[in-house]
A protein has these predicted regions:
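Conserved lysine of the Walker
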Residues: 12
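Short phosphate-coordinating micro-motif centered on Lys-Gly-acidic
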Residues: 21, 58-116
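P-loop (Walker A) phosphate-binding loop of NTP-binding proteins
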Residues: 5-7
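Short hydrophobic/aromatic beta-strand immediately N-terminal to the Walker A/P-loop
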Residues: 1-3
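Conserved nucleotide-sensing/catalytic segment adjacent to the nucleotide-binding pocket
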Residues: 28, 33, 39-79
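Alpha-helical phosphate/pyrophosphate-handling elements in metalloenzyme active cores
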Residues: 25
Length: 116
């Protein structure tokens, strides 16, 4: 699981596009804001989630979250703050922040397990 933290327009979907490219996913990556999850096939599956509209972590189980975890792909989670308590302990966290004084600059901090 890769969990993004950052406000609107910080580049969460853009980061996922790069991830998809690295996994050789051929489909165009779009934000799953209204669908909750988009699936992409590549060397391994990529499941792109947008948790913005979920009321709480309990709603994850209504969308089959555990099934996605068991499918052996990468789960990229936008708005992970809304469901943080339900994410696995080995989640990789990607914090995206705007660089002060720059419209398009970002500081990206990646934390979590090592050796992935």
């Amino acid at each position: 699981v890769i969990a993004y933290r950052g406000g609107l327009g910080m580049g969460k979907t853009a980061f996922t596009r790069g991830l998809a490219r690295g996994l050789d996913c051929r489909d165009r990556v779009t934000s799953p804001t209204f669908t909750i999850v988009n699936e992409y096939q590549g060397r391994i599956p990529l499941f792109h989630f947008d948790m913005y509209r979920l009321p709480d972590a309990d709603a994850l189980f209504d969308i089959g979250w555990e099934d996605y975890l068991d499918r052996g792909g990468v789960c990229a989670v936008e708005w992970s703050e809304n469901v943080a308590e339900a994410l696995p302990t080995d989640t990789v966290w990607v914090d995206l922040r705007r660089l002060e004084g720059e419209d398009n600059g970002r500081r990206i901090t990646i934390t979590g397990v090592t050796g992935f």
